[in-house]
């Protein structure tokens, strides 16, 4: 029984020591903001106040029934995000006249802009103002004022004076 306990303890120490560098390899390189369904920085359909680096150009493809969206996103300045998207709505016809539409589904295009008003500081969040679906049909039109702040969370495991710390960023 004592042999099994020592073996278990050695295995736990080995796994704890090897997990920390592996987590750093996977968590920190991918800490840039993600794109939402509309092709702008955010989560799912919610925009955030974060922006990618100046000079970034990105392409985004999102499928969330009944919407399929393709987007081109550009960051010409550190304070501006501009995107163009083309949307296919699977459950609606192109026209109210079924004989005119045939099997063609409804399509929509739109242009979005987001302006960063305040950059994140130690106590102040990122603040941005955005307008969605400019020069489109207005189906997905929205105006928003959004704030985003990074929060660091630390977790520790301490056993026999051996400590492993995992740092996560919630955004």
Where are these regions (language model features)?
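Transmembrane beta-barrel domains of Gram-negative outer membranes and organellar outer membranes
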Residues: 20-139, 150-164
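Bacterial N-terminal signal peptides
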Residues: 8-16
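Cytosolic catalytic regions of ATP/NTP-dependent phosphoryl-transfer enzymes
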Residues: 147
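Histidine- and/or cysteine-centered catalytic micro-motif in compact active-site loops
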Residues: 3, 150, 171
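Bacterial N-terminal signal peptides that target proteins for export
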Residues: 1-7
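Active-site pocket-lining/capping segments in soluble small-molecule metabolic enzymes
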Residues: 163-171
């Amino acid at each position: 029984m004592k042999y099994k306990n020592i073996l278990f303890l050695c295995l736990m120490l080995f796994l704890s020591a090897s997990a920390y560098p592996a987590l750093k390899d996977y968590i920190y390189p991918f800490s840039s903001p993600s794109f939402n369904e509309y092709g702008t920085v955010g989560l799912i359909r919610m925009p955030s106040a974060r922006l990618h680096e100046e000079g970034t150009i990105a392409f985004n493809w999102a499928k969330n029934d009944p919407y399929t969206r393709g987007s081109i996103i550009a960051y010409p300045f550190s304070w501006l995000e501009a995107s163009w998207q083309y949307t296919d709505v699977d459950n609606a016809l192109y026209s109210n006249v079924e004989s005119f539409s045939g099997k063609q589904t409804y399509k929509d295009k739109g242009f979005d802009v987001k302006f960063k008003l305040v950059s994140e500081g130690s106590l102040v969040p990122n603040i941005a103002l955005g307008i969605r679906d400019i020069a489109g049909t207005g189906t997905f039109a929205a105006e928003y004022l959004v704030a985003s702040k990074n929060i660091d969370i630390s977790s520790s495991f301490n056993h026999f004076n051996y400590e492993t710390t995992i740092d996560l960023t919630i955004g």
